[in-house]
Swiss-Prot record:
MF GO annotations: spermidine synthase activity
Positions bound to spermidine: 64, 88, 158-161
Protein's UniProt name: Polyamine aminopropyltransferase
Active-site residues annotated for this sequence: 158
Natural source organism: Shigella boydii serotype 18 (strain CDC 3083-94 / BS512)
HAMAP family: Spermidine_synth
Length: 288
């Protein structure tokens, strides 16, 4: 039997992961980017950009459930949600499951990303693009948060790593804009990489966010294809009580929501804010 082609991730120089490629569904390599979607027997459809896995059908639910349900249930009565990025539609899918949310705005810099993902990753959006509460805005995320007249209860930054096009979503200009259009007691969250390998990302985000929010921290989860340990999510708000809600309060909100999740549950919610000592020490050692 012929040996299967392998795709190797290039995120780190000294080690990494590979996937057997059963079938290439799409591959575009230009001077600006290298985008591929292929099928793998273990992880389903895999999308990678510039040599780095962005999402897989098998484990995306962990990332998207934790990015949405943690801030939305901590807030408790979010009506207006902003998603920056998220063109694959999975973040939108999870937000639409909250029936008390009245409007969902998604800002994507490239309209082609949405149509592309609708075609090649239909399980990610699961029809959520057709939700009547959803509005798509084609714009740069930094520009939008600094110019919009809308305000939001929860802002979710579904950004790539802080290199290339995703770098602007880790800047002070972006964080300042998010603070500008966030309602009182609103919550901002963003992915911040695998902290064991990308600790400087967390430190940098913590330092910048602390200029604009009184309560800044992280919560975490483990996602198989984002290897190297736990992935951290930045958390920023001016209501410090929201990060310390009891499991009983979250449980009551969870039951009232009617959510049925594959990863998230109220115990996971409260436990996610417990961080490893090496990250706590790194954050504490930074000048204020």
């Amino acid at each position: 039997m012929a040996e299967k082609k392998q795709w190797h991730e290039t995120l780190h120089d000294q080690f990494g992961q590979y996937f057997a490629v059963d079938n290439v569904l799409y591959h575009e390599k230009t001077d600006h980017q290298d985008l591929i979607i292929f099928e793998n027997a273990a992880f389903g459809r895999v999308m990678a950009l510039d040599g780095v896995v962005q999402t897989t059908e098998r484990d995306e639910f962990i990332y998207h459930e934790m990015m949405t349900h943690v801030p939305l249930l901590a807030h408790g009565h979010a009506k207006h949600v902003l998603i920056i990025g998220g063109g694959d539609g999975a973040m939108l899918r999870e937000v639409t499951r909250h029936k008390n949310v009245e409007s969902i705005t998604m800002v994507e810099i490239d309209a082609g990303v949405v149509s592309f993902c609708r075609q090649y990753l239909p399980n990610h959006n699961a029809g959520s693009y057709d939700d009547p509460r959803f509005k798509l805005v084609i714009d740069d995320g930094v520009n939008f948060v600094n110019q919009t007249s809308q305000t939001f209860d929860v802002i979710i930054s579904d950004c790539t790593d802080p290199i290339g096009p995703g770098e602007s979503l880790f800047t002070s200009a972006f964080y300042e804009g998010c603070k500008r259009c966030l309602n009182p007691s609103g919550i901002f969250v963003a992915q911040n990489g695998v902290c064991f390998l990308q600790q400087e990302e967390a430190i940098d985000s913590h330092r910048k966010l602390s200029h604009y929010f009184s309560d800044v921290g992280f919560y975490q989860t483990a996602i198989p294809t984002y290897y190297g340990g736990i992935m951290t999510f930045a958390w920023a708000t001016d209501n410090d009580a929201l990060r310390h809600l009891s499991t009983e309060i979250i449980q009551a909100r969870f039951l009232a929501s009617g959510l049925k999740c594959r990863y998230y549950n109220p115990a996971i919610h409260t436990a996610a804010f417990a961080l490893p000592q090496y990250l706590q020490d790194a954050l504490a050692s930074q000048p204020s």
